[in-house]
Regions:
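Extended active-site and interfacial segments that coordinate phosphate-rich ligands
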Residues: 80-89, 94-99, 369-400, 408-432, ...
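Conserved catalytic core of nucleic-acid polymerases
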Residues: 187, 241, 349-357, 361-364, ...
Length: 628
């Protein structure tokens, strides 16, 4: 790290650190002596609620250093504990033993612990020798459950302004803005300025709990938060800190091969086109396809507008000209190289040799987890090249990769929610649900269902869960509109419970202005009666999908919580590493593989009790691709 004087020289003296105030009515108290620390411990022991926050040198909990910790035990006062970082680790000013005393006091406290974006703070503390095992109330996750469309205003400062009327100090006033190339570390800011800022963060979190809890109760979100979201936080902390192993030599070889193939494909595109153009430019590609080569698609467009060059449109043209499959391959190779093959090595943490993705609980409206830096939930599986990327995800030395994938979880949730007797019976008999659906709508014995019939039934099964219309079915399968209408009619005649549930859900959306998942996660809909028909239809599709996808996401999260507890209680060294929608990946020592296989199957299939059985498929191999 550069010397501090060199960093400070970037600022004029008058603008070095901003003003010495937090913008909040919080009295800061700094722990500087053993007497101060003892008083803080007494307050923790007698507190009903404790809010905490960490100050760090960065925003990546797997790499940053801790600068300090703030705590509030009653409104209006915030304690700040500066941290000293040494070669041996870290310690509070009064000595390293104090950190253990503080950790013990928090974990044995009968108080509610609260934090804003708790996953980050718990992860930072764990990395610095303070594992918080006490349940933690996360005000950010609570706010997201209350209003899933407030994603841009989930930060502590906006919420304090909204709920408390505070105009809090922004961190940029202390460390500068990264976009201006003038940002320093929080470690370099004087204690007299850090303390009030940090104390206010803890105090704001403390007081936000009261502001949010009334809404949590009014909206019936207690089960969602206390049984699903809050217990999941330490599981995600473990997964992020553990990371996933990457086969770097394999990626290096794959990069050379894919890069060579990419160049060859681009040269072939230019040869077929008869000229060089920018394949990555939608405008230039559209001009080549639709004007120069004269390809036509079945859409209406203004004379001056070019049809789309998005993937779904190009797929429709795949057999119309030899340039189209080449363009699709070029796109896939370029994306895989830029997003994974060449990007993953740069994301490997040099201290651990692993990639540490970030799992996000407050992004997807239905409650599904998302991941970022890198996004491991979009690694392709349905193409040869995509599966080759998956081959780079491996176990630790001596370990294997275990994948447990829920079988048709969203359709099982649909059968449960709709209480459809025919669909439930098919699952309870263990039938191939897509073949069973095909037999029902095509009026043929189950044994005589053809692969094509099963494929159509599969599309409608999954499409129903996403609110698909007969028009969409026709577009996605090549059916005529009349055939699609008849197919849907036959489907709903057989599965009348599904039709009834769809209609009830749509009416609820219009009447109540929201729909909810099994554990109460709501998706609100603003007054729909005055909206255009197209907007109402789109809202109906979202309303149908939300309880299905959201409930499935809750089941997966509960399974993750159960698997983690069972692994810990059993003393296993196996670690969960990646979650992709309805699939869990684990890094398993080979000597534990038999026991862990059965443990994971049991915990996933018994995660919740539905009117249909939950089933999971287990695979093991040397890498992610090999488990299938």
């Amino acid at each position: 790290m550069p010397e501090i004087p060199e960093q400070l020289s970037m600022f004029e003296p008058s603008e070095s650190y901003g003003e010495a105030h937090s913008g909040a009515p919080t009295v800061p108290r700094i722990v500087q002596t053993s007497v101060d620390f003892a008083e803080l411990l007494r307050e923790i022991d007698s507190a009903d609620r404790i809010a905490f926050d960490t100050e760090t040198t960065g925003v990546d909990m797997t790499r940053c250093d801790m600068v300090g910790m703030s705590l509030t035990t009653h409104a209006g006062v915030g304690w700040y504990l500066p941290v000293e970082v040494t070669d041996e680790g870290w310690r509070l000013p009064a000595g390293s033993a104090d950190a253990l005393l503080l950790c013990d006091a928090l974990n044995r406290s009968r108080a509610m612990l609260a934090a804003h974006n708790a996953k980050f703070d718990i992860g930072v503390l764990r990395r610095h020798g303070m594992p918080i095992t006490h349940p933690v109330y996360d005000t950010m996750i609570a706010q997201f459950a209350i209003d899933p469309f407030a994603r841009g205003a989930l930060g502590l400062k906006p919420l304090a302004r909204q709920h408390l009327g505070w105009d809090m100090q922004e961190i940029e006033s202390l460390i500068g803005r990264s976009s201006a190339g003038r940002q320093r570390s929080m470690r370099d800011v004087p204690l007299a300025l850090v303390a009030p800022y940090a104390a206010a963060d803890a105090d704001a979190t403390f007081q936000l709990v009261d502001a949010l809890q009334s809404q949590v109760h009014a909206l019936g979100l207690e089960r969602l938060l206390y049984e699903v979201e809050f217990p999941l936080i330490p599981v995600l902390v473990d997964m992020e800190l553990d990371g996933v192993a990457i086969d770097l030599p394999y990626l290096a070889a794959l990069s050379k091969e894919m890069t060579a193939r990419l160049h060859a494909v681009e040269l072939e595109i230019y040869r077929v086109a008869g000229r060089i153009f920018n394949v990555a430019s939608p405008q230039q590609l559209g001009n080549m396809l639709y004007r120069v080569l004269g390809l036509q698609v079945d859409i209406s467009a203004d004379a001056d507008e070019l049809p789309s060059t998005r993937a779904h449109r190009l797929e429709e043209l795949r057999d119309k000209h030899p340039i189209v499959p080449l363009v699709l391959e070029q796109r896939e190779l370029a994306k895989l190289l830029g997003t994974y093959v060449d990007a993953l090595p740069a994301l490997v943490n040099p201290a651990t040799g692993r990639v540490h993705t970030h799992f996000n609980q407050a992004v997807v409206v239905t409650g599904r987890l998302s991941s970022s830096n890198p996004n491991l939930q979009n690694v392709p599986i349905n193409s040869v090249n995509g599966r080759r990327v998956r081959r780079a995800f491996i176990g630790a030395p001596g370990n294997c990769v275990l994948s447990s994938d829920y079988s048709q979880i969203e359709l099982r949730v649909l059968a449960h929610l709709a209480d459809d007797a025919v669909l439930r019976a098919a699952f309870q008999r263990g039938e191939d649900i897509h073949a069973s659906t095909a037999a029902a709508v095509y009026h043929v014995p189950l044994a005589q269902v053809t692969p094509e019939q099963r494929s159509f039934a599969k599309r409608i099964n999954f499409g129903i869960a996403y609110g698909m219309s007969s028009y969409s079915l026709a577009r996605s399968t090549g059916m005529t509109d009349e055939q699609a209408d008849q197919f849907m009619a036959d489907y709903f005649k057989r599965f009348s419970g599904v039709r009834r549930w769809l209609n009830v859900t749509k009416r609820q959306m219009m009447r109540d202005g929201f729909v909810a998942t099994m554990y109460g996660r709501r998706r609100p809909f603003t007054e729909m009666r005055s909206r255009p028909t197209s907007e109402v239809r789109r809202a109906e599709r979202l309303a149908v999908n939300h309880p299905v996808q959201g409930s499935a996401a809750e089941i997966v999260k509960i399974a993750m919580i159960r698997v983690q507890k069972a692994l810990r209680d059993g003393g296993f060294q196996t670690r969960q590493t990646v979650q992709v929608h309805d699939e869990l990946l684990l890094d398993v020592p080979r000597e534990e593989s038999h026991d862990v296989r059965e443990l994971v199957r049991r915990e996933m299939e018994e995660a919740v009790r539905l009117s249909v059985p939950l089933k999971s498929g287990i695979g093991m191999g040397d890498n992610w691709d090999a488990v299938k």
